[in-house]
Design a protein with these regions (language model features):
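Catalytic cores of enzymes that engage adenine nucleotides and/or redox cofactors via long glycine-rich
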Residues: 64-212
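Beta-rich, aromatic/charged-enriched effector core domains that present basic-aromatic interfaces
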Residues: 1-111
């Protein structure tokens, strides 16, 4: 039997290719996410006003470190949850059988497993929680594990959502007055900054990086 040719292609669910990250890192004594993030903002024209960042600052992290008062966060919109279908239920049973000793639980699994469900979760975040995400993105409150977060990491990594559409949805919320700039910038920084940067570091410096 003849060999089957294998073609390796770039993952289209990241906006920075491995080559582009290597070019960014070339010649730098130290890698900083902030500088990479600014480069990505310029390249993809995200939250830009001409050649300058929207609002005059690249990073609004200083505005995004508030704590809840003594009464806590107050009303929190519910995040969409989904009843497992036949396929998902089968996978849950498989996990419970083969990986019973692993940490975690699938007893209350309700995450999106279809694109339409993932879009529903994204739109719920944009419409109901994004405006408050920035101020309290680092805050914690006992008994409230989700607060104003988006719950889309799994959907992104499973390719049910594309990072570009997530970023565009958040930026549109700012430009139409539905969410303030610090909240939108803080959220976009997680997607266009940290997610892309950590992936770039992984491909460039692993496995040695894990031992530092």
């Amino acid at each position: 039997v003849g060999a089957t040719p294998l073609e390796m292609r770039e993952d289209r669910h990241f906006l920075c290719s491995r080559h582009e990250f290597a070019v960014h890192a070339r010649g730098r004594k130290q890698l900083r996410m902030e500088y990479f993030y600014r480069e990505m903002r310029r390249r993809h024209r995200v939250l830009m006003d001409g050649d300058q960042p929207m609002g005059g600052a690249w990073n609004y992290d200083a505005d995004n470190r508030e704590a809840f008062g003594p009464n806590g966060p107050g009303f929190l919109p519910a995040t969409p949850r989904f009843e497992p279908d036949v396929i998902t239920q089968g996978v849950i049973e498989l996990v419970e059988t083969r990986f019973a000793a692993h940490p975690g639980s699938v007893a209350s699994f309700g995450w999106p497993v279809k694109r339409a469900q993932a879009l529903q979760v994204l739109h719920s975040f944009i419409d109901e929680r994004l405006e408050h995400f920035g101020r309290w993105q680092d805050a914690m409150w006992q008994g409230e594990p989700w607060l104003y977060h988006a719950h889309i990491s799994a959907a992104l990594n499973l390719k049910l959502l594309n990072p570009r559409e997530v970023i565009e949805a958040a930026e549109a919320a700012f430009r139409t007055g539905r969410a303030p700039l610090p909240a939108v910038e803080g959220f976009i920084r997680q997607i266009l900054g940290w997610r892309e940067y950590v992936r770039g570091i992984y491909w460039q410096q692993m496995p040695d990086y894990a031992q530092r």
